[in-house]
Regions:
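Cytosolic nucleotide-utilizing catalytic cores of signal-transduction proteins
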Residues: 1-132
Length: 132
């Protein structure tokens, strides 16, 4: 566990910046994202292209909803300074685009990892700057 913490805590802090404490699953998730980034597999590249082609506010909504809050629409809205109905609208738009509901497993597994890799590549943008 010590080795996991020492190697992947910085990545976990980048991927999950609003967490105060990290458990073993968080660190293993960070390790998986870090490995995906280093291996640059075709799935990672495909997902990064999909995320890059989306509007910035939709990607930020996904990260807030899936990574920063426990899939809580109201908390995601508070984090992004938008109304919860805006979050619902954006998630519906994303669902239509991807063909599945974000957060529902197992369909969302690759999406979670892609968002983690996205944060490792680009850091954590300040959601307060997003607006509508």
């Amino acid at each position: 566990l010590y080795q996991l913490v020492s190697q992947y805590l910085p990545a976990a802090r980048t991927i999950l910046p609003y967490r105060l404490f990290f458990n073993q699953a968080d660190l293993e998730f960070a390790r998986g994202c870090q490995r995906e980034l280093q291996e640059e597999g075709t799935e990672v590249i495909r997902w990064q292209k999909r995320l890059d082609s989306m509007q910035h506010n939709l990607v930020e909504t996904l990260m807030a909803f899936l990574l920063d809050t426990p899939q809580n629409i109201e908390q995601a809205g508070d984090l992004l300074y938008v109304h919860r109905n805006t979050i619902k609208y954006r998630l519906n738009k994303i669902s239509n685009r991807f063909g599945f509901v974000p957060g529902v497993m197992p369909e969302s597994f690759e999406l979670y990892q892609a968002l983690g890799v996205h944060r490792l590549l680009r850091g954590n943008d300040d959601p307060g700057e997003l607006g509508e």
